[in-house]
Amino acid sequence: MVGSVLCKRLQTLDIPHLKLSRHPSLSSEDQVFWDPDERILETEKLREVETVIHLAGEPVGKRWTHEIKKKIIFSRSDAGRFLFETLAAQDKPPKTLISASGIGFYGVANETKFDEESAKGRGFLADVVEDWESAPEPLHKVGTRVVNMRMGVVLSPDGGALAKMLPVFKFGLGGTLGSGHQMMSWIAMEDLIRAIMFFIENETLQGIYNLVSPNAVSNVEFTTILGWVLKRPTLFPVPALALRVIFGEMAMQTILASQHVIPKKLLEAGFEFQYPELEQALKHCLGREKN
């Protein structure tokens, strides 16, 4: 989802770029075939690449069976590590790696506000993110600048949490999830893409950065604002018990989890959010700015 939007932005700006693809039939001048399961990568096309942006990862928004957990781990840590080890072994490794990560690192806390200096939390996602962020170490060792982006909920009608909510809310069946008090740290897709470009352009930036709006909201606030933007009622709450029964562990660490995360380092670096408030962000991504 993010990769497709980013590629369109790069194309608009006439910035040459290559896309990794798992489909050999799609291999072309701007496509690079790779199969991390079989440890295959078309390295000859990557010799002159200066910046690598790694965004791959199995979606976490489904019940976490044993097999799903294995896919979540492999797609982030193992596949990434294979890519980074291969790139690090080239005669000319890339100058910059910008890699996706997640705010799941911080675990769950009802009262705490997390910034980049906050300690690792507990749970499956916290462990996944810790391993995910260690995967670029081979590139770090050869001098590549590494940026790890701990992303919050990315607002897009084309994928992720918002895309799953929209059909329900449009039918007027939306409502709060659980108590509704849990904090949700989000970022507009436009600001995420702008932040990636910001990291590319500012070569002194490296390390961990939280990619979330400065203004986290509670689930009650999110529900109310989304209903208002769509001009639909939000009268059908979903009990926490139902979510736990349906989604199990995943519900406790995502849907019902409270995470109030602050983009401290990003703001200190001078980044300016175009959509820092939820209402304007939702209106933009849903094409309702004139309403």
List PLM regions with ranges.
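Glycine-rich "substrate-gating" loop/helix at the edge of Rossmann-like oxidoreductase active sites
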Residues: G121-L125, G152-G159, S179-M189, I200
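C-terminal amphipathic/interface module of NAD(P)-dependent oxidoreductases
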Residues: Q253-N291
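Mid/C-terminal beta-alpha module of Rossmann-like enzyme folds, strongest
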Residues: N202-E249, K283-K290
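Alpha-helical substrate-binding/gating segment
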Residues: L166-G174, Q182-V217
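NAD(P)H-binding glycine-rich loop region in Rossmannoid oxidoreductase-like domains
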Residues: V32-A79
